[in-house]
């Protein structure tokens, strides 16, 4: 079972992602947060395998999902199984500059929000397996 934390400032998006991904037999949504500042604490508490991060989220310590990915990498965050926590950026902004920043911050993948549910689930599986998704 792949343990997933959702981080998006829009509650409707978080709940829709949780509902869709919850239909996958090998994915478990372990938590949801609405700001970059909540990500580190939630990861420390819930120890997910993969964190889905929106790029633009409110926060004072962590200004966006890309900064949250870098903070998780720098903190050496680990999952319940002891493996490094992987991050997947999920955003409406598919511009090359965002992709480059995300990968430089240690994100394992980058997908746009108009990706289908099956493709997103597969991206989570690939990121969990240590592969890069762009």
Q: Locations of the language-model features?
A:
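Conserved acidic segment of CheY-like receiver
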Residues: 1-13, 17-21
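Short amphipathic alpha-helix used as the core "switch/output" element in two-component signaling
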Residues: 41, 63-83
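Active-site residues of response regulator receiver
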Residues: 54-55, 91
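Alpha4-beta5-alpha5 switch/output surface of CheY-like receiver
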Residues: 64, 95-98
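C-terminal output helix
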Residues: 97, 115-128, 132
């Amino acid at each position: 079972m792949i343990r997933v934390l959702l981080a998006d400032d829009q509650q409707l998006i978080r709940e829709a992602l949780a509902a869709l991904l919850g239909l996958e037999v090998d994915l478990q949504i372990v938590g949801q947060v609405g700001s970059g500042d909540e990500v580190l604490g939630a990861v420390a508490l819930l120890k997910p395998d993969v964190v889905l991060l929106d790029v633009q989220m409110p926060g004072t310590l962590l200004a966006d999902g890309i900064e949250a990915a870098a903070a998780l990498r720098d903190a050496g965050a680990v999952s319940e199984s002891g493996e490094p926590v992987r991050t997947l950026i999920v955003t409406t902004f598919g511009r090359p500059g965002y992709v480059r920043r995300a990968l430089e911050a240690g994100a394992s993948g980058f997908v746009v929000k108009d990706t289908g549910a099956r493709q997103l689930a597969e991206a989570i599986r690939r990121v969990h397996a240590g592969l890069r998704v762009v």
